[in-house]
């Protein structure tokens, strides 16, 4: 996954995820990981009204389950205070007629720093396995 702001990009990793896939004839395997989110500013924005883009570098359509922004972190580094629901638009990225990625566009105001929580799910990664893929991302934007 990549975050694009001000014509610059940075990679974003998930801090929590679960994936299921086929593991041979009639069986499935799952991979689950859980960590601690870090909201270190991943990118600097040069104006109050930012228009970041997030690219999911896979052909499966992500479904945004929750996307929230916060202005504060507590003493332990967790988001605190009122949350703002972020509205975003999702579009396909095509190359030679094939979907190669999905672009999530959103607008936000960055006065000083903003901290974001994004939870997504993906349609069945393997039709033989009933679980969807899920991932949680945390990132920050900082005003220059």
For the regions a protein language model found, what residue spans apply to each?
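Mature extracytoplasmic domains of secretory-pathway proteins
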Residues: 18-86
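Beta-strand-rich interaction surfaces with strong enrichment in secreted/lumenal proteins
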Residues: 42-45, 91, 105-107
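Surface-exposed, short loops/turns at beta-strand junctions within beta-sandwich domains
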Residues: 96-98, 105-115
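Internal, hydrophobic beta-strand segments that form the core of beta-sheet-rich folds
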Residues: 111-125
